[in-house]
Amino acid sequence: MPTRLTNYFLRTLREDPADAEVTSHRLLVRAGYIRRQAPGVFAWLPLGLRVKAKIERIIREELAAAGAHEVHFPALLPREPYEITGRWEEYGDALFHLKDRKGADYLLAPTHEEAFTLLVKDLYSSYKDLPLTIFQIQDKYRDEARPRAGLLRGREFTMKDAYSFDATDAGLDVSYQAQRDAYERIFARLGLDFVIVQADAGAMGGSRSEEFLHPTPIGEDTFVRSAGGYAANVEAFTTVAPPARPFEGLPSPEVHDTPNAPTIQALVEVANEQSPRPDGRVWTAADTLKNVVLALTHLDGTRELVVVGLPGDREVDLKRAEVAFAPAGVEAATEDDFAANPGLVKGYIGPWSAGGPVLGEEAATGLRFLVDLRVVDGSGWITGANLPGKHVFGLVAGRDFDWDGTVEVAEVKAGDPAPDGSGPVELARGMEIGHVFQLGRKYADALGLTVLDENGKLVTVTMGSYGIGVTRILAIIAEENNDDKGLVWPEAVAPFDVHVVAAGREQVAFDVAEQAVAQLEAVGLDVLYDDRPKVSPGVKFGDAELIGVPRVLVVGRGAAQGEVELWDRRGGNHTTLPLSEAVAALTTSS
């Protein structure tokens, strides 16, 4: 039976929702696909469910072809497994916490590693049961501080999460590649451009980690890529350290008066005025060592200040810092932090003063001093002297100051060398649509998932984790497939195959439209039929364009002669032809 608009639950809107930030949010609400319930929480209406179901069907088909089996877990899970793996604390405020009437702690699951691991532990005990890959498509929950952009960053979202279980690392490599290949097929069928980038595993843990990013200007992620094929999320980018330099012939450090120069820009200006370079070049921000104080909050609640030294032409990238210091939280030091550490002279912080080392666990301040990988033995710097209005010139790393370790927190810039030697990188924006991890034995170790191997010895199972953001994909498809009139869905995920519009006021238009619907359904096409009798053609046309079914068949003025108009929403073509030819054309293109 066709879906008739006279009795379909649908209401389109002429005005954009006030809170819409991106095109997909605006059009999905206006066209009647979703409806906001709370910040980051949406109701799914019939049209939206149809598109979502088609995306899920493609995912299921490709995962089944890769040998995965579908299961379904509850969203409400007990605290204990997450506490055992440490994620109850690691996720922090991002978890939705609940208590039952007896006071027991529960959560709304952000991901299900623990549940999958315990299920396999309960049921499997031998290497003969492996390899195994199981998945679910289910709603997830994260208490986003600032949900935004409609479905792109919500508190409730639908996700496909799959997990592989193998007795050996070699087996994990095979399972991982099978899922990676399946992802490529899924995104190709959905018509999504994607880039596979090296990524950080974050709170998920594990070793090998890759993201599938859809390049888009509204993307939340910055990634880098080189002409030679290197690609990585900025959080996973590895800085190429320059070679160490000899100390011989380098002058001793000198402390200079640099009043009113607490910023890098002011320092460079003063340096070029007071102490021009002997080689005739000008001092730049890259010649200065910026020392930034960061505050770390550890899982036990303790707060630690660390000082990070990096070239002055670089800013601290907080996302990279969060990865570098995980699982601790990271923020800039506050005025109270500086007040509690008078040895740090704000605006003039440096690792060395006339009295000797200042920073480092063995120095007077006792603060850890970590440096960027570009700070190598023999490199000379202009940096703070830990005295108001004073900087030290010619301070040489490895000779005049040491550090407690290196850290990757500096921003990545276009032109930085790729770590694999494939050339300079460029920066781009993208939105994560899929993520594959080799979790290894983190969760199996924590939860005791072992099997007997072929020698009768207990071995810990090694795992992979594979996620796809279903609702995010739907939003991205909407974001990339629209025009000034409304949505234009790709045929693979469109809510219907054909949208038939009875546009005339005479009964003959409705009679011919009924014939068209019957013939289209007879050849297996899924039809949305606008049979509303008291709605003007203009309103019907507007709704058809807004809803975005890519092929529209209009029955109007030519109905009495058996002619209809075929619209190609994507190409913009309108063709008048006999009904039989229109049905044949729609059948051929399906």
From Swiss-Prot:
E.C. number: 6.1.1.15
Superkingdom classification of source: Bacteria
Record-level Gene Ontology MF annotations: aminoacyl-tRNA deacylase activity; ATP binding; proline-tRNA ligase activity
GO cellular component: cytosol
GO annotation, biological process: prolyl-tRNA aminoacylation
Subunit structure: Homodimer.
Protein name per the record: Proline--tRNA ligase
Species: Leifsonia xyli subsp. xyli (strain CTCB07)
